[in-house]
Structure formats: structure tokens, C-alpha cells
Amino acid sequence: MVPSRRTWNLGATPSLRGLWRVGRAPEPEPGMARPAPAPASPAARPFPHTGPGRLRTGRGKDTPVCGDEDSSARSAARPALAQCRALSVDWAGPGSPHGLYLTLQVEHLKEKLISQAQEVSRLRSELGGTDLEKHRDLLMVENERLRQEMRRCEAELQELRTKPAGPCPGCEHSQESAQLRDKLSQLQLEMAESKGMLSELNLEVQQKTDRLAEVELRLKDCLAEKAQEEERLSRRLRDSHETIASLRAQSPPVKYVIKTVEVESSKTKQALSESQARNQHLQEQVAMQRQVLKEMEQQLQSSHQLTARLRAQIAMYESELERAHGQMLEEMQSLEEDKNRAIEEAFARAQVEMKAVHENLAGVRTNLLTLQPALRTLTNDYNGLKRQVRGFPLLLQEALRSVKAEIGQAIEEVNSNNQELLRKYRRELQLRKKCHNELVRLKGNIRVIARVRPVTKEDGEGPEATNAVTFDADDDSIIHLLHKGKPVSFELDKVFSPQASQQDVFQEVQALVTSCIDGFNVCIFAYGQTGAGKTYTMEGTAENPGINQRALQLLFSEVQEKASDWEYTITVSAAEIYNEVLRDLLGKEPQEKLEIRLCPDGSGQLYVPGLTEFQVQSVDDINKVFEFGHTNRTTEFTNLNEHSSRSHALLIVTVRGVDCSTGLRTTGKLNLVDLAGSERVGKSGAEGSRLREAQHINKSLSALGDVIAALRSRQGHVPFRNSKLTYLLQDSLSGDSKTLMVVQVSPVEKNTSETLYSLKFAERVRSVELGPGLRRAELGSWSSQEHLEWEPACQTPQPSARAHSAPSSGTSSRPGSIRRKLQPSGKSRPLPV
């Protein structure tokens, strides 16, 4: 059976496959006209099946339509019309190129508005009246000063006017008139300068006005471009709305009523459901795009309002600027008129006063003519007095005696004043030296002090044993040497005479020694010819110890004072350089050769593997260590010195401290160096091994001179490795420590050449700048790579193992001796030198 049929125009209505192709059509390119979508077929409900694989149609396309059939066809065509409308506005959706283009245009307009607001803010800050107000205030102050000057001139003229006419010796009024004219010319010059400043201010105002006009022109161009862009976007928007309206106004293309359509394929049903879903998605996109267009219109309207406000503000700023400029010009013009009027009045008054002065001058001349008879009378009186003067010799002698007494008293007063001035000069000299020492400390210069030994019996007698060294009575940093009949002066940090004691010398270096406790590296070395007293200054005797023992005693006293807050450990090592061989003075085998190496931890410091290290707890321990070291040091007899040191001795004192409250660790090192004396082989009579020793000593001291010369000239390469001595002193001379040199000199005539060389070397060393010393301190606990083993105190301090590496920790000083043992499994840090 065939069901009742409804009419369907197969020539005008596309099939379902055609509708599917329309739904999947690609989007048109931006700027091109979008073709109108094809009308959709009715897809509101599935059609009844009539047979497999085909659609049944009823009447032909000319068959008339009944009433109920017409209403059914309309209801069935509504989904197709909705899909057609959705396709007509789909080109303006959020994902379409044209919608993206509109969004970009709106963002571009927003950026333009922001840049214009920034430009207006910049103009507002540039066109502020701060500079103009400052210039105006300066001009007002200048005009006020000129007014005060005019008032002062008027007061002087008034004083001249009120002064009674009388004799005018020396033309005083003429001089005052000349001064008034000079003041008048000065006021005119100041007025010209004020006019120049005014013209410069006007020029600056004109430049700012031109700049403002230029900025306004640029702003107007930007606003015009923005208006054109807005007009173009509005036009495009109107075209889009018109296109949408025209597409909506089109009548649906369905002209015939569907009669009967039956779907006989499951694939066709699926295509129909997909088409309906796409219809719904397109409708949502249209609603979303309409909302976006509405927001864009609101943003565009707000940008228009902001532009109008900015234009109004610019106009207001222009009016304020013009008003301020006008007020300033009026004020300046009025001030200039007042100034000109005051100058003219002062000039007129000065002319009147000049006339009065000339009249007074004429009266004075008349008075002079009348005084000539009186002058003749006075001449006669003078002749009479002259005759009387012949009887005044006795009176003159009496007067001379009184004058001599007064002169003697004046001389005594001058002498007392000179004594007071000399006392003040010496006080200022001491203050200058103190300031100079502080400057040297800040710069890091090597401080140099000189000590002159007394004349001894080894110097002999005769002309060669006379004293060739003198001192400045007012300045203790100046030393004078008489060399070959010519005096030579040297300036050092401090000069000690032969009468100076060991304590006096130690007081000069005491501050450096105490800085070792605070974590600084300190080096004190003695330099000079053989027999000049270096070993005596550094080591001294048992009754009168030198710097070495006094320094350690001072360290122990300082450690005891800080025992409540700090824990300190003091270790001592001693070495000598004999014939360019480094030997351990405290070891069991003093003849063993040691080497100087770099620390493997990358710190750049030097250390001596195998150097014996003693931990000392008291002064008795120090004395025992010194005695043990003295027995191993090399000394021999020469013609110049009975106990000549044939090696460079080095005493290394390491102070490690821990702050009990903060855990701060400090490590300070004190190097006390007793250099072997330079000598001339002809004088010392060295032969054999003594000659070889002298050659090595002179070679190492020459290398030290090369290092000082390189440091003084700030060369890039400093030859520290030319000798064991300079290599060992590298840390002390490379700017990481506080260094002091004690130069020992002989005062007798036969040693003036060596004394001259030593003092010249001292001056060169004094000019070397190493930089301020660095404090070695860090927070944290001591390294746990070593452990301490306590042993009871014994008669002789025991060495703390052969120092294959530097100790990394320490403990507080306690009774008894401490021996440091390295753990077999641990690797300790190398000992820095």
C-alpha cells in the first residue's frame, strides 16, 4: 500500500546530500563576498519508510496544494529556514577571519588610546610650571636685591647731603663720588645681566611653547587618524548589519509543500541528525558574535569619551600656560620699569650731590689761601723749636735707655711665643704622623721602621768608627746619613735611636700583633746588613727578649682577657732557609729538606708539607720552643759578626679562635722573619762554605729587592718564585696581610755604603701599596676531619704531628699540651704559610 502523498518541488529544493555539502563548505577569505547559503531541506523528523534504498514522491511539481498540506509543509520547512539564517550570519562568528579582524582592529584602537594617554601625561609633566616658577622666583630675588642696593645708595647720598660743608682734605667727596659712579655702573651691569637672564627665560618659554604646539599638532594628527579608523570600522559594521538584515529579509526558497518523503537508509538518517546538530552550533556562534559586537561598540564609545576628556584637559593646560606666561611677562615688565625709574632717580640725586661737592671744594681752596699766613707763623715757631732741640742730647740718651729696656722685654716675649709655637708645631707634627699612619693602614702600605744599633767594640776605633747617623730632634721619622761628606735624609714611619729599648720597639708593632687575634695575617721581618742587630731585635736575650717572645706573651694576655667569650688555640712552627734549602727547626731531623706547595683546596695559599707544629699553652712552652729552635739554627763566625746568622729564620704563629655565642671562627697568622744579613765578601772574609752561604744570602735578598720593585711599579708579574725566601713570603707581600719591616742600620762611618743601601731599600718598600688586609673569619663549626687527643703537660712541648696539611680546627686553651692526630680515613686541610 502507498500512503497518502504530499507535494514536494524536486526542482527547487536540494536533497539531503546537497544540504550536507553546504554545511561543510569552506569559509570565504577576509574581504571577499560570502556566497549565500543554499536553503536547507526539512529535517525536523525522520520520514516514513516506503521501500529500501529510495524516496517516494507524489504529485508532479504542477499539482495544486491543499490547505492542510500547506500548513504541514510550512511546519516542516521551518528548520530549513533556521539553518539558512544561521548560515547567512555564520561569517561573523568568533572563529571566522572577519570577526578576528574586527577584534584586532578594536585592540589596535585600545593601544592607540593608551599611547595617547601616556603622551598627554608626558606633556603634562613637561609643561609644568616648575622651571618657569623657579626662574621667576630667581628674577624676583634679583630685583629685590637691586632695590635694596638702590635704597642703600639713596641712604649714602642722603648722608652726603646732610653732612655739613667744611674743609675737605684730600678731595674725599670726589672719591666718594667716584665710588658712587662705580656703584652706578655696577648696578647698570647687573641690570644688563638681569635683562640677559630675562631674554634667556623668554627664549626657553618660546621653545617650550613651540614644543607644545608640535606635540598638539602630532596629537591632532593621531586623533584624526583615529577618527578615520573609527569611521571606517563604523562603515564596515553598518555594511555587516545591512548584509545580515538583507539575508534575514530574504524569503525562504521553499515554494512547494512537501508531500511525502520517506527515508529508507540509516546513513541518510545519520546525516540528517548531524545537520541538525550543526544548525544548533551555528546558532550559538551567532549569539556569541552578537555579544562580542555589542562589547566592542561599548569599548568604542568609552574610547570616544576618553578622547574628549583628554582634549578638554589639553585645552585647559594650554589656557593655564598662556595665563601664567602673560602674568610673568607683566610682572617682569613692571619690575624692569621700577628698576629703571630707581636708577634714574639715583643718578639725578648723585649729580646734585656732585654739584654740592664741587662747591665745597671751591670753599676749601679759599680757606687754604687764608691759611698761608698761619703757615708762615708756624714756620717761625719751628725754627725756634729747632734751636731748642740742640739741648736735648741728654733727653735722647734717657729715651734710648728706656727703649732698650722695652726692646729687651719684647724680645723675651717673642722668645716665649716662639717656644709656645714650637710646642704647638711638635704637637701638630705628632698629629700629622698619626694621620699618616692611619692613611698608610687604610692604603695597605708596608710600614717601615728603622732602628740604629749602638756603637760596639767590633766597630773598632779611629775615623771609620765615628758616628755618621743623626736624628731630627722635632720629627722622629727623619734620619740623616753623612755619606762621603754629603748629608742624605730619609723619611720612614718611625726611627729609633740607639738609646731605644726593646719595649719601645715592640710598642710600635704591638697593634699589628693584636690584629692577628682578630683574624688578620701579619708579617714582621727584619732587614739589614750583617751585624746590624736584626736577631737582637727579633729574638733578644733571656733578660731582654725581642719581638718574637713579646708578641707571643701579648697574644696569651689577650687570649686570657677574651677567655669568657672566645676559645683560642695558638700553634707555633719554625723554619729556616739555608743555602736555598727549607729546613724544619722544630723537627726531629732538622737537615731534612722541605718543599713549599700550593694548597690543593684551590684557595691559592701556600703550605709546607711535613713542617712540625707545636701547640703552646703558656710562656714556658714558648721559651722551650725557642730554645729548641735556636739549637738547630745555623750561625757562624765572620769578620763582621761573631754570631752571624747564615740562614733566614721564620717563626709562624697561628691563632685560631671561636666565638662561643655566635660560632664565628677566625684564623690569624703571625709570621716573624729574621732575614740573614747582606754582606760584602771582601769585608766579611768569607771563604769556602761561608762564601757559598754569603752568595745564597745575597741572591735571595736580591730576589726580594726584585719583588719589591715589581710591587712598587705595579707590574703584572711579580717574581716570587725566584728564591725560596720570596716564595715563602708571597702571602705576606701579595696584599693579603699587614706587613711591617724593621730595617737595622749601623751608625759608623765604615758601614755608610751598606746603611745607605738599606735606607734606600726601606724607602722603596715603604712606597709599596698592598691594599688593606683581609680578615679571615667564617660562621660554622670547626671541621670534623681531625680529632684532638689530650695528654698531660710534660717538660717539653710535644709536636702536633708532622703537618702534612693545615689544621682545620682548634679548641680553647687549657692546661697541658695537646697533640693533633690525623684520622687514618680522613684527609686534613693543608697548613697555609
Swiss-Prot record:
Chain intervals with Low complexity compositional bias: 30-48
Keywords carried by this UniProt record: ATP-binding, Cell junction, Coiled coil, Cytoplasm, Cytoplasmic vesicle, Cytoskeleton, Membrane, Microtubule, Motor protein, Nucleotide-binding, Phosphoprotein
Keyword Cytoplasm: yes
Biased composition (Polar residues): 806-815
GO biological process: epithelial cell-cell adhesion; Golgi organization; microtubule-based movement; microtubule-based process; visual perception; zonula adherens maintenance
GO molecular function: ATP binding; identical protein binding; microtubule binding; microtubule motor activity
PANTHER family recorded: KINESIN-LIKE PROTEIN KIFC3, KINESIN-LIKE PROTEIN KLP-3
Function: Minus-end microtubule-dependent motor protein. Involved in apically targeted transport. Required for zonula adherens maintenance.
Protein name in the entry: Kinesin-like protein KIFC3
Taxonomic placement: Eukaryota, Metazoa, Chordata, Craniata, Vertebrata
Gene: KIFC3
